[in-house]
Regions:
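Conserved alpha/beta-domain cores
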Residues: 1-66, 70-90, 97-134
Length: 134
């Protein structure tokens, strides 16, 4: 698993994918916590979207990580932003939750959200769109 969390790793993601092409299994973790600090919060959606496009075109599975349903896992009540973020995680092959007293409930909630989102997301399209983040 290539954990992508720095500007350098984002810029080098195409090369990382090419280098790992012969090594199976291989996947990419979008480590959004450190990445937000590196690229700035205002660019997070753009950067993670382009990383998803690139991995999708290369048929590389993605782990959507860092602070997914974090408030819900720890306090039992999700924020509106967390719910939208969880819904957008449907584009990834895997979603990573942190530990907490409500993690089982978070798994159930996430399953319900992702099941409903399947019909709304375009996933595994055959064409790589233009990348603009680097």
């Amino acid at each position: 698993i290539a954990k992508i969390e720095t500007k350098k790793a984002i810029k080098n993601l195409p090369e990382i994918i090419v280098q790992a092409a012969g090594q199976q299994p291989f996947g990419v973790m979008i480590a959004r916590g450190d990445m937000a600090v590196e690229v700035g919060y205002e660019r997070m959606a753009e950067i993670q979207e382009e990383m998803l496009w690139l991995c999708e075109a290369a048929h590389i599975p993605v782990i959507w990580a860092t602070q997914v349903l974090e408030q819900f896992v720890t306090e039992g009540i999700p924020s509106r932003a967390e719910m939208t973020d969880a819904a957008m995680s449907e584009r990834a092959e895997c979603v990573m939750l942190n530990k907490g007293p409500f993690v089982a409930e978070a798994v159930t909630l996430l399953d319900n959200v992702l099941t409903r989102m399947q019909g709304h997301q375009s996933k595994k399209t055959p064409q790589l769109r233009a990348l603009h983040s680097w």
